[in-house]
């Protein structure tokens, strides 16, 4: 692989490369594995497949967590056959990183391809017109990365400009929108393929009496991929803009870094989430909104449409109550959480797709 960077004067750059208007989402595609689990029966499956049926109190606690999650089902590549073939995935702390990596490095790009093909089909333009690829996943760090593998799977031009983002978790979905906006608006004529592909095999493991937040991870996450085509200046009659990306911002809430952590270990990706996370979000969400929307004169949070990442039901409930949102404002977020679980980076793009579908129905 060869990367070449040409540096021009600022005057030339402004004349030749700048956009004519804000970036727009021109197509959306989503995909999930065919295999899925029913949340009501999942505790029985989970404790059986991990040989943990003797942990009766722990199993009942897990059942309560699942019942409160407001999740109906989740799609997963994990099947009973795969888990029986790889028993080291079913313990809590056996060394299993190699096993997980072998599966993830293959499955993440393949699932991403499914969503990308749907987005490209909706876009309706030749795949050769894609100029940039930005890809993110929480799992399966490898080199060449999932972006390179997807380039081959799709048959993209060898000159396509790629950016790979690993292990940014739920934050990555919105971050990808920001990156795609920046790329599209600073490269005249660019058509950016955005792909978020998540296979949460990395956090699957058996129960631990000492690490109770592990049960939350086993209850919450699902597999899925989402893809967008983003560009400026849609060609009339050839491209149909769905959403316009006006601005993007990111804020760090002070003193919160110890409350939500994922670490790569020999046992896979460990998950640690304190009970304070929903409170931190609800206490700070309005300040973030004020900073983002004040330049546009928007202060009525019910006057805008919402694509809230549903990190969990408590977060959705807390934001709705804190901001006084009407129930329908977060309906798309609740529907995606219910039907798919937390899809980490792909989640907000699934919700964006739900919002667009509902908008079409209401026309």
UniProtKB/Swiss-Prot annotation:
Which residues are annotated as active site? 170
Q: In which pathway does it act?
A: Secondary metabolite biosynthesis; flavonoid biosynthesis
Reaction equation(s) it catalyzes: (E)-4-coumaroyl-CoA + 3 malonyl-CoA + 3 H(+) = 2',4,4',6'-tetrahydroxychalcone + 3 CO2 + 4 CoA
- Share an example GO biological-process annotation for this protein: flavonoid biosynthetic process
Q: Which GO terms describe its molecular function?
A: naringenin-chalcone synthase activity
According to the UniProt entry, what is the EC number of this protein? 2.3.1.74
- Transferase is among the record's keywords: yes
Q: SUPFAM superfamilies attached here?
A: Thiolase-like
| Keyword terms of this UniProt record | Acyltransferase, Flavonoid biosynthesis, Transferase
Instruction: Kindly name one Pfam family recorded for this protein.
Output: Chal_sti_synt_C
Report the sequence similarity comment from the record: Belongs to the thiolase-like superfamily. Chalcone/stilbene synthases family.
What biological function has been recorded for the protein in this entry?
The primary product of this enzyme is 4,2',4',6'-tetrahydroxychalcone (also termed naringenin-chalcone or chalcone) which can under specific conditions spontaneously isomerize into naringenin.
| Protein name as annotated | Chalcone synthase B
Species, as recorded:
Ipomoea cordatotriloba (Tievine)
Query: Gene encoding it?
Result: CHSB
């Amino acid at each position: 692989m060869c990367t070449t960077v040409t540096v021009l004067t600022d005057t030339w750059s402004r004349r030749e490369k700048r956009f004519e208007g804000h970036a727009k989402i021109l197509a959306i595609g989503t995909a999930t594995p065919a295999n899925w689990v029913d949340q009501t029966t999942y505790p029985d499956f989970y404790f059986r497949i991990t040989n943990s049926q003797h942990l009766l109190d722990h199993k009942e606690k897990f059942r309560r967590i699942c019942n409160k999650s407001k999740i109906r089902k989740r799609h997963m590549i994990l099947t009973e056959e795969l888990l029986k073939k790889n028993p080291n995935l079913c313990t809590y702390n056996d060394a299993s990183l190699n096993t997980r990596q072998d599966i993830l490095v293959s499955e993440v790009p393949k699932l991403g391809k499914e969503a990308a093909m749907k987005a490209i089909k909706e876009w309706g333009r030749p795949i050769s017109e894609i100029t940039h690829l930005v890809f993110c996943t929480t799992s399966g760090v490898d080199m060449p990365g999932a972006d390179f593998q997807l380039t081959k799977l799709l048959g993209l031009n060898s000159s396509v400009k790629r950016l790979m983002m690993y292990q940014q978790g739920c934050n990555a979905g919105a971050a990808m929108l920001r990156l795609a906006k920046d790329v599209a608006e600073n490269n005249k004529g660019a058509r950016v393929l955005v792909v978020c592909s998540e296979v949460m095999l990395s956090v699957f493991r058996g129960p631990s009496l000492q690490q109770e937040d592990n049960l939350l991870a086993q209850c919450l996450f699902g597999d899925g991929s989402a893809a967008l085509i983003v560009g400026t200046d849609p060609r009339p009659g050839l491209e149909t803009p769905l959403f316009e990306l006006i601005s993007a911002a990111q804020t760090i809430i002070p003193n919160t870094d110890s409350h939500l952590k994922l670490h790569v270990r020999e046992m896979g990706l460990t998950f640690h989430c304190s009970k304070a996370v929903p409170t931190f979000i609800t206490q700070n969400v309005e300040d973030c909104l004020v900073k983002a929307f004040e330049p546009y004169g928007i202060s009525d949070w019910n006057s805008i449409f919402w694509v809230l990442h549903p990190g969990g039901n408590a977060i959705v409930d807390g934001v709705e109550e804190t901001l006084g949102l009407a129930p329908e404002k977060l309906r798309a977020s609740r529907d995606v959480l219910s039907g798919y679980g937390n899809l980490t980076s792909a989640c907000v793009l699934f919700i964006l797709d739900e919002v667009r579908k509902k908008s079409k129905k209401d026309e």
